[in-house]
């Protein structure tokens, strides 16, 4: 009882500010250090993202820094050992880079496509994409294809911005908030802050989700929808709005293509395309001039409804007329979709009308003068205060692209976009629809040795000519992105890389580089088979591995590292420089363009290097033109120098703050040699706050677009007209019908998919996998969610966060469990068409009765992530991934195709259907189980049963 309390010695402490990396929010953090140790982490009250709020993940960043899973040195697979055995020899960084440089030099000088470079949740895609482009390989993407590309693509092909990084609810003025399929890890602190504001003002919060946890637990109303039915629900709401004539006429005719005229010529070329003038402008019918006029002009009076005969004799119809014909069909009436959605018809109609009431009867008006892009002066901004947000619950279905477009259709009808109280854009968005960036598809450039690509590997196709295919229609990318199978795969298909590379379909790789991507475990579908593929050998090629050389870059000992031939150890986020750039996935908020940095707060105690630095060095070694001087010597001394001095175009660099030689310019300006120091002085972030006249209606706000054009966010200063009807989709449909003057698919499967799924108006169809499985045999939907306190496999190694959860359960509806004789903590079998697992069950009321679900990535392979072999994560935790195939179930007469959205290639994680039954007595423990991973050389960490951490005395035991 005489023990003295050890008080803080503030004189020995130092406070530094940086950016969190415990999830994708990128919150600002205040880090207290003592003797090169992290004492504690707090939120930065001045930061635009989190305003001082910090979640469990962010606070537990200390235990990421002191994780026992950290890699310690470069490692090479020992000669004579098999891939996956985990037997390695330490090598020096110089040796490692020499080995990699020699291999990459040979690939680049012969066939650059033989390199695949794919990255996980790295938040530095502007650099990794540039690196791949300079190497000359089309085979690059980040993780978006298995994350939420459906959200991004649907938004960027519809409204010019999107859910996630490119837009946010206006929490300050919203009066009604509808959340679609958002797990509680997503945009964690900003949403928490926003919901508190909404609740304090008495706004209504409605959630659409099969599961009621996290954010949904505090919703005023929960709609427990059946998975994959969200688009049908949205279209039923559209039906209600149109039936009751609840739409914003002025918004539709000024800012959308609702009045544009569409050619009606079924079976003929040009059917479904916009009627255009000789300058390619879309035409409308002007009801005052009684003439066809340019639909982009400002002084027009467009007809919103109507059918006309064009000067060339073709019949044309307004987009709005086509929408009314489709969505007023009784197919979409609430009473006719209620059973499919699992929701009361009354609730569907009521919520649609509630939104309309708030939009049109509780309008927000702000006395702000602004000028539109046509030169008209406005003395106020009018906001329809209905905000929405959507994420993976919509995206992770093979119908998610159209479902998200349907949600945007509601927003457009209500006029509830980029104005007070609704869903607002975040810089550098909005952009032209779609953005004017096309993927590299010139086969001569792709095949050229030692030659950078002329365009980025990723982009936004608008027609079949933009596909990345050869003259015979074969894919030029290893993941088949931008092929006839998935034409608008704007983020690639990382989940298909290992399968395609193993099958040499469409060709073989020589080297695959994976950065921070746990593709041997929770980031892949069909996990056990993927591990087998990584070990697979080509017996026709002297037993060479089918993927000959595999490089893994990670800071931690994940399940993936043991399959590497070469392991390059990365630093933690507190040990390196980073830029969170406006060229990439910035931290902007609706009222400010913002970016941020990280810089080393503590010195690594291991032989590790930041992958950013390694990429810059490799770029110099390989003599990439953007990274070398005319004499072939490196242009940049390292990553910091690169970030300061690289310019995508004159004055446009990775960081937007403190540009210009004297640091006085924002967004655009010459390189500033003191730029890093200025960011550090400003607590590691920069924010350019928009003046009031540039905050709203930015798709048509001349004052904003002038600045955006100068900053490189957009090209010309012209209106960004929102698209109910997507002409790019119709061009692909025409190609499938054989009616397109340009490339057309020669495979019947591809033709049928284009005709069926490339509808220019949002459509709903049953998820693809569910079309091919017996629903009576597999009666349950099965999902995963990310918990609020963990972010994928990053954090279930974290000793503080593990105390919250070290075992995931399969959750099911309590009433359904009683019917089946299942009770809490029973062991059950769960089986899909692809495989089966054994796991432990818990029951809950807040789950749609036909749905079972679990937390994502809690389950671990024994020996991974610095955990003991008997850790609960390995013995009781489990993955749902084993049940999910990366390919659709076989269909007679059809090649196997990806289990993804047919438009975007989004991985269809949530299309899964399963059956369940109680395990027999004695059947306990999670299944399947895998051999334990071996400790890696240099892993001398203790794994205590009880942890005490105190930076003041360096206690950790």
Residue ranges and their predicted role:
Residues 600-601, 611-670, 795-811, 815-957:
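Long, contiguous, secondary-structure-rich segments that constitute the structural scaffold
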Residues 319-324, 330, 335-490:
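Active-site phosphate/pyrophosphate-binding segments
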């Amino acid at each position: 009882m005489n023990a003295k309390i050890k008080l803080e010695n503030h004189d020995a402490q130092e406070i530094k500010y940086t950016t969190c990396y415990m999830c994708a929010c990128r919150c600002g953090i205040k880090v207290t250090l003592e003797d090169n140790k992290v004492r504690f982490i707090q939120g930065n009250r001045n930061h635009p993202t989190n305003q001082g709020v910090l979640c469990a993940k962010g606070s537990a960043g200390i235990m990421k820094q002191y994780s026992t899973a950290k890699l310690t040195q470069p490692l090479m697979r020992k000669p004579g050992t098999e891939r996956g055995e985990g037997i390695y020899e330490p090598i020096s960084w110089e040796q490692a880079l020499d080995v990699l440089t020699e291999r990459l030099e040979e690939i680049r000088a012969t066939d650059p496509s033989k390199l695949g470079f794919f990255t996980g949740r790295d938040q530095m895609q502007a650099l990794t994409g540039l690196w791949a482009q300079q190497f000359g390989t089309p085979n690059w993407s980040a993780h978006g294809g298995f994350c939420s590309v459906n959200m991004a693509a649907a938004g960027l092909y519809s409204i010019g911005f999107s859910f996630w990084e490119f837009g946010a609810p206006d929490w300050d003025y919203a009066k009604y908030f509808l959340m679609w399929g958002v797990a509680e890890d997503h945009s964690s602190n900003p949403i928490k802050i926003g919901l508190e504001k909404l609740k304090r003002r008495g706004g209504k919060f409605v959630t659409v989700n099969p599961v009621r946890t996290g954010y949904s637990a505090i919703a005023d109303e929960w709609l427990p929808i059946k998975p994959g039915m969200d688009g049908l629900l949205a279209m039923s709401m559209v039906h209600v709005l149109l039936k009751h004539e609840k739409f914003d006429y002025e918004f539709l005719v000024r800012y959308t293509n609702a009045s544009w005229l569409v050619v009606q010529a079924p079976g003929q070329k040009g059917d479904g395309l916009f009627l255009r003038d000789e300058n390619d402008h879309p035409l409308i019918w002007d009801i005052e001039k009684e003439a066809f006029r340019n639909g982009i002009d400002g002084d027009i009076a467009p007809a919103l409804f109507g059918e006309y005969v064009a000067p060339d004799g073709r019949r044309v119809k307004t987009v709005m007329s086509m929408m009314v014909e489709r969505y007023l069909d009784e197919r979409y009436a609430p009473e006719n979709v209620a059973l499919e959605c699992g929701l009361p018809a009354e609730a569907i109609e009521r919520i649609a009308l509630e939104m309309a009431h708030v939009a049109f009867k509780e309008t927000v008006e702000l006395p702000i003068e602004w000028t539109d892009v046509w030169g008209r002066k406005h003395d106020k901004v009018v906001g329809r205060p209905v905000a929405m947000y959507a994420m993976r619950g919509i995206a992770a279905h093979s119908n998610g692209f159209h479902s998200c477009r349907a949600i945007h259709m509601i927003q457009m009808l209500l006029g509830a976009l980029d104005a007070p109280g609704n869903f607002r854009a975040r810089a550098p968005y909005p952009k032209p629809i779609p953005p004017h960036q096309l993927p590299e598809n010139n086969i001569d450039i792709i095949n050229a040795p030692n030659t950078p690509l002329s365009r980025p590997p990723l982009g936004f196709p608008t027609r079949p000519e933009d596909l990345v295919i050869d003259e015979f229609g074969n894919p030029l990318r290893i993941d088949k992105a931008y092929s006839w199978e998935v034409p608008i795969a704007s983020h690639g298909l990382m989940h298909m890389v290992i399968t395609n590379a193993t099958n040499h379909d469409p060709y073989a790789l020589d080297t695959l580089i994976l950065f921070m991507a746990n593709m041997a475990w929770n980031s892949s579908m069909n996990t056990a088979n993927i591990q087998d593929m990584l070990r697979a050998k080509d017996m026709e090629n002297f037993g060479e591995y089918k993927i000959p050389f595999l490089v893994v870059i990670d800071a931690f000992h994940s399940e993936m590292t043991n399959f590497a031939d070469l392991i390059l150890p990365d630093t933690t986020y507190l040990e390196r420089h980073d830029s969170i750039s406006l060229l990439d996935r910035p931290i902007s908020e609706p009222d400010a363009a913002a970016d941020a940095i990280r810089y080393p707060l503590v010195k690594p105690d291991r032989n590790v290097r930041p992958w950013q630095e390694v990429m810059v060095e490799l770029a110099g070694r390989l003599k990439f033109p953007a990274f070398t001087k005319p004499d072939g010597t490196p242009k940049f001394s390292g990553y910091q120098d690169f970030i300061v001095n690289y310019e995508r175009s004159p004055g446009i660099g990775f960081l937007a703050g403190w540009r210009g030689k004297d640091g006085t310019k924002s967004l655009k300006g010459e390189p500033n040699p003191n730029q890093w120091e200025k960011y550090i002085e400003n607590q590691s972030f920069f924010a350019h706050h928009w003046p009031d006249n540039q905050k709203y209606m930015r798709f048509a706000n001349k004052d904003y677009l002038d600045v955006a054009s100068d900053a490189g966010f957009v090209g010309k200063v012209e209106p960004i007209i929102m698209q109910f009807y997507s002409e790019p989709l119709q061009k692909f449909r025409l190609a499938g019908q054989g009616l397109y003057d340009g490339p057309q698919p020669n495979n019947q499967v591809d033709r049928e998919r284009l005709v069926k799924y490339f509808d220019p108006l949002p459509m709903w169809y049953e998820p693809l996998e569910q079309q091919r499985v017996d629903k009576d045999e597999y009666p349950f939907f099965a999902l995963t969610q990310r918990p609020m306190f963990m972010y994928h496999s990053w954090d279930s190694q974290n000793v503080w966060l593990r105390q919250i959860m070290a075992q995931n359960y399969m959750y099911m509806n309590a009433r359904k469990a009683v019917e089946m004789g299942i009770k809490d903590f029973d062991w059950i079998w769960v089986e899909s068409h692809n495989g089966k697992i054994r796991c432990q069950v818990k029951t809950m009321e807040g789950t749609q009765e036909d749905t079972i679900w679990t937390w994502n990535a809690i389950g671990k392979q024994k020996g991974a992530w610095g955990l003991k072999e008997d850790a609960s994560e390995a013995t009781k935790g489990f993955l749902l991934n084993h049940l999910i195939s990366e390919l659709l179930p076989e269909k007679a007469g059809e090649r196997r195709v990806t289990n993804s959205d047919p438009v975007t290639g989004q991985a269809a994680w949530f299309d899964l259907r399963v059956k369940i039954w109680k395990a027999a007595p004695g059947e306990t423990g999670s299944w399947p189980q895998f051999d334990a991973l071996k400790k890696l050389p240099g892993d001398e960490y203790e794994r205590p049963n009880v942890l005490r951490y105190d930076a003041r005395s360096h206690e950790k035991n």
